[in-house]
Amino acid sequence: MGRLFGTDGVRGVANADLTAELALGLSVAAAHVLAEAGTFAGHRATAVVGRDPRASGEFLEAAVVAGLASAGVDVLRVGVLPTPAVAHLTGALGADLGVMLSASHNAMPDNGIKFFARGGHKLADELEDRIESVYADHRTGAPWDRPTGSGVGRVRDYDEGLDQYVAHLVGVLPNRLDGLKIVLDEAHGAASRVSPEAFARAGAELVTIGAVPDGLNINDGCGSTHLDLLKAAVVEHGADLGIAHDGDADRCLAVDHTGAEVDGDQILAVLALAMREREALRSDTVVATVMSNLGFKLAMEREGIRFVQTGVGDRYVLEEMKEHGYALGGEQSGHVIILDHATTGDGTLTGLMLAARVAQTGRTLRDLASVMERLPQVLVNVPDVDKSRVTSSAELATAVAEAERELGSTGRVLLRPSGTEPLVRVMVEAADIEQARSVAGRLADSVKSALG
C-alpha cells in the first residue's frame, strides 16, 4: 500500500480509490491514534464531521461517522459546510477531532478526507503516518479495540454550525460592506449557503451564481478554477467586484469591476497593506510560496513589508506562520490564511476582508490591486526526465546561472520536480512575455539534455 495521505489529506476517485471501507478504517484508526496520543485523556471524545455537496459525500460521511462512533467517539454532524467552517467549529466547540469530506477544486467523481486536530489545525505529518500504520496493521489482521454498551459513540446533527460560523466571519470584519454590489460564484460547492449569508449580513448587495448544488455539478465550469462566468456577470450587472470560491471554499479569487482577474498574490498584497494600516500585520511580514509572482515580492519590498518564502503548498505557509507568529500568508492560487481569525485557508473570510478594504477606502479593487504588477510568467513541463538530479546536475546549474544573469533583477527562474510524475516544471518570469518564453524554452532544452 502506497502512502495514503498527500499534502491535503487523502484523495481519490470516490468508490474506486476512496471507498467506504477505507473511510471507515481510517476514521477508526484516527480515533485510536489520537487516544494513544493522549488527546482524549480524562473525557469522552467528540468529533465534528462535515462535507461538501458532491454525491459521494453522503456515503463517505456515513462511513466516517460509523467508524468514529464504533471507536467510542461522539459525533457532531454539521452537514454541508466549507472546510474552514469545519476547522473553526472543531476549535470553537472544543472538539478533539474534525473531519472534512471534500476533494476541494477537483472534479465531482473525486472526494477526499481531511482530519483536523483539537483547535482546528491540520494533523501533524507524524500523526498521519501513525494513522496509516495503524490502519495497515488492521488490514493485515490486528484487531480493533472496540467499546461496547455505553462506551460506543453517539451521533447527532449540529444544525447551529452554519449560523455560528457566519456570525464569526461577520464579527471579525473591520467594517461593513454597505454600498458595494458583489457577484459571488460558489462553484456549486460547500459555501453555497454560507457565503451569500455572510456577505448579505455584512451589508453587501449580491448577485449569486453557481450556488445551486445538486451533488453532481460541483466545480463544473464555475468557481475559482473557471472564472469566465464570474467575469461576465460582474460586467453585466455593473458590480464593484466578484468573488469566486472552489468546491470546499478554502480558496478565493476575485474579479475587478472591469472583469479582470485578481489572483491570490494581488489579494495578499491588498490585505497586507490593509492589515499593516490596522497594526495587525505582525512583524510587517507576509508569507507566500516560491510560486508567487516576482511582482509580489517587488511590491512588498517597495512598501516596506518583509516577504518570507516557503515551499509550494498552503501547509508549508501555515507552518511558517505558526512557527514565527506571522498573521498573513497564502498562495497565488487563492489559499489565503489570516491566522488571527482562521486556522486554515478560508475563501469566504478572504473575500469578505477584500471587499471590506474596497468599502473602507472607496477605491476600486482594480486600483487597490495595482499596488503590484504581475510579471509575465511562463511554465513549461519537461516529461520523462530524472527529476531526482535537478539540484545535482552541474550542466543544469550552469544553464540556470546563465538564464539568471540574462534576466537580472526583473526576472527569475524556478526548476521544480513534480511530486507525482516523472517531470520537471520550468518556471520563468521576465519583464516581457517574449523574453520569458525564450528563456523557458532554452531551459527546457537544457533539462532534457542534462536529465533525459
Swiss-Prot record:
Transmembrane feature ranges: none
Q: What positions does UniProt annotate as the active site of this protein?
A: 104
Q: Where does Mg(2+) bind?
A: 104, 246, 248, 250
- What GO biological process term is on the record, naming one? UDP-N-acetylglucosamine biosynthetic process
Describe how it is modified after translation.
Activated by phosphorylation.
Q: Which GO terms describe its cellular component?
A: cytosol
Q: Which UniProt keywords apply?
A: Isomerase, Magnesium, Metal-binding, Phosphoprotein
Q: Which sequence positions carry the modification called Phosphoserine?
A: 104
Query: What broad class of enzyme is this?
Result: isomerase
Query: What cofactors does this protein use?
Result: Mg(2+)
Q: Indicate whether Isomerase appears among the record's keywords.
A: yes
Q: What PANTHER family does the annotation carry?
A: PHOSPHOGLUCOMUTASE (ALPHA-D-GLUCOSE-1,6-BISPHOSPHATE-DEPENDENT), PHOSPHOHEXOSE MUTASE
The protein's job, in short, is: Catalyzes the conversion of glucosamine-6-phosphate to glucosamine-1-phosphate.
HAMAP family, per database record: GlmM_B
> How is this protein named in the record?
Phosphoglucosamine mutase
> What organism does the record attribute this protein to?
Streptomyces coelicolor (strain ATCC BAA-471 / A3(2) / M145)
